[in-house]
């Protein structure tokens, strides 16, 4: 059984985001392209965004640190450390109100020939 410290990883990714022109950094902690389940820790500096994009499939967002705003066409949700939301299956965007770290969990269907 393998485990990691989300607290340590969050600090590491925030530091990396601070050195990045995009103001963000990410690390997949489970899964990837050959798995149906993927969990990614994403750090986003205050004022930076993940611009509007299509939903990748069934997904949830857990705020590990900071304060973020998730927007869809008709709705807005704000979350702080410890908050959790199921991401609607529609176009959405994420904005960091404060330096923030989230864990994004996505369930994707694999191609039938995989």
Model-derived segments and spans:
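Glycine- and acidic-residue-biased ligand/ion/polar-headgroup-sensing regions
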Residues: 57-73
